[in-house]
Design a protein with these regions (language model features):
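N-terminal cap/lid segment of alpha/beta-hydrolase-fold proteins
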Residues: 20-58
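Short substrate-entry loop that stabilizes the transition state in hydrolases
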Residues: 59-61, 67-107, 171, 233-235
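Mobile cap/lid helix-loop segments that gate and shape the active-site cleft of serine hydrolases
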Residues: 71-76, 160-161, 167-168, 172-216, ...
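Alpha/beta-hydrolase active-site loop
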Residues: 109-129
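Primarily recognizes the serine-hydrolase "nucleophile elbow" in alpha/beta-hydrolase
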Residues: 124-128, 133-183
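Active-site-adjacent alpha-helix of alpha/beta-hydrolase-fold enzymes
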Residues: 196, 229-295
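Short beta-strand/loop motif that positions the catalytic acidic residue
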Residues: 225-227
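Catalytic active-site module of serine/aspartate enzymes centered on a nucleophile-bearing elbow/loop
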Residues: 291-343
């Protein structure tokens, strides 16, 4: 029998109906005892530190790659500890790579080197334990959501499913949103430190590090993009980033009317002709407001801010298999009682 989570109540439907919305509890701030710190050799000669777990089983198992947030590193637990708790309980392998740390240095912030660090973390994990290559998953919120979308576009061949929450789609655009009257705030300053300059629209270095530059290559990847509708007001990333990201990967016939994005953000009301999302109990109290699907890509805007709903994210990923049709129905989800960790 797989071990139960200490902070995540995992049970099957016999003990708790999946349709029951759950009351949120604070996310854990420490890694589970089973998680260890490791050093992963990098192709540039450096050593990438990471948090790691693999069950003792010699059978092939899913691998979850958890991506740290904008200002965090491999060692930062917070809501990312929920990813680890899930893996311990479900018998998955887990790696939480550093990919050059917080996003205020040139090697970080979605650089080629940071992208390669994630690729090499996956390769290293496969050397340590038997990994089911049809079940390699990627998850992140905020800066981790940015990197998740970037990895979906840069290396679509790896992932069985990518869950990206409140991610930045365009670095130059986000810099502009965090510059008021010519004065950059801390996030804009981080970007300037990483790039070596203040980017303007069309800046090639900022564009290369932006998911919009490559998301069209992620069309074959099951990609779940989610964003709280209060983000940008009670949070640092306006949900218009999710709308643009969705359109970047969606087929032309499935794209949303980009002319309505600003109206939606300003009013927080659905534009004419946009239908309310159907119920999705996996979101608990963070009720979906709008949902749209095109091919393997789904957009969900929910009642929330700059945060991830772990229950929805992890249960959706668990349904996906590389090479098989995407699965959107998660009505038989495993309930979690830890939700709502924001990304920083």
């Amino acid at each position: 029998m797989k071990p139960l989570l200490s902070v995540i109540a995992l049970s099957f439907l016999t003990s708790l109906p999946a349709q029951t919305p759950l009351i949120s509890k604070p996310a854990p701030k420490r890694w589970p005892a089973q998680i260890t710190k490791v050093g992963i050799p990098c192709s540039d000669g450096a050593t990438q530190e990471a948090m790691w777990f693999a069950p003792a089983s010699t059978e092939k198992k899913p691998l979850l790659v958890g991506l740290h947030t904008w200002s965090s590193s491999y060692a930062s637990a917070g809501g990312d500890a929920v990813y680890a708790e899930w893996c311990v309980a479900q018998g998955w392998a887990f790696v939480h790579p550093d990919f050059r740390g917080p996003n205020w240095t040139a090697p970080a912030l979605g650089s080629d080197r940071a992208v390669q660090d994630v690729v090499e973390a996956v390769a290293w994990a496969k050397q340590q334990t038997q990994v089911d290559e049809t079940r390699i998953y990627l998850i992140g919120v905020s800066g981790g959501g940015h990197m998740a979308m970037l990895m979906a576009g840069r290396h679509p061949e790896i992932w069985a499913g990518v869950s990206a929450w409140c991610g930045i789609d365009d670095i130059a655009q986000w810099h502009a949103e965090h510059t008021k009257n010519g004065v950059p705030d801390k996030y804009a300053q981080n970007i300037e430190a990483a790039l070596g300059h203040a980017p303007t629209k069309g800046d090639p270095e900022a564009w290369k590090r932006s998911p919009l530059s490559c998301l069209k290559q992620a069309a074959a990847v099951p990609l779940d993009i989610a964003h709280g509708i209060h983000d940008g007001r009670a949070g640092s990333v306006p949900f218009t980033h999710a709308l643009r990201a969705f359109n970047a990967v969606a087929a032309e016939a499935g794209r949303l009317d980009a002319n309505a994005f600003r109206l939606f953000y300003d009013t927080q009301k659905l534009p004419p002709g946009w239908l309310p999302a159907p119920p999705d109990a996996s979101y608990g109290v963070k009720v979906p407001i709008f949902r749209h699907i095109s091919g393997n890509t789904r957009l969900t805007l929910f009642e929330g801010g700059h945060e991830i709903v772990h229950q929805a994210a992890l249960n959706w990923l668990a349904k996906q298999r590389r090479g098989q049709p995407v699965v959107w129905d998660v009505r038989d989800f495993i309930p979690l009682d830890v939700e709502g960790e924001s990304g920083k």
